[in-house]
């Protein structure tokens, strides 16, 4: 069935990615200054925030509210070049539709974090509290899969990444992406970034030790609210959801209007779009 095909495709994809992990581990060297600068929260919406769906606008507004004194930079397809240089072949492949927006965004977040550090938060992540110190002060932080032997092999989520500049894992991920796209004009697997991350962090004892230092927080509660967006709003339930996590991964593709093109009434989604949940 579909799930079995997805799992098999993921396993084959991971086998294909191993050569890039091995090459990066052999050639990587860094003597960059790893002094921690001002902590920056990075967000990106390709078309510009003014053209974003309402869900995205509310999520970004929540980050602005709970940035807790950290610098907050919102980028688009034009302003990213003020901060990073993207290889010409990656830009060309993105322009030609080979590298889709999601995978292009994967490269952008990795390049930004490798150079500057800070916290990358997808534009579809809602914050309901300040960024905790264990995130801001971590050498590397990602939400993780509590099912360590998940058949999909997806051990982390990359919609929220916090790191110091020039972190070895993040810099190696950047190199893996660059090598992969230089040699391939196809998507190995939709989740190939996550598969590559897992392979990389399991590839040497040193990298295993670095990954083991990340405080474990499951991505399951982070994704809980998405499943309840279209249910009737309940104040008590909202308190419970907020107590599960300070961050909540949503989807901008969530149906906002009913068949009469009216905002779906009395739901969590309606409250969110009206700005009542921030």
What is each residue range found by the language model?
Residues 107-116:
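Small-residue hinge/turn detector
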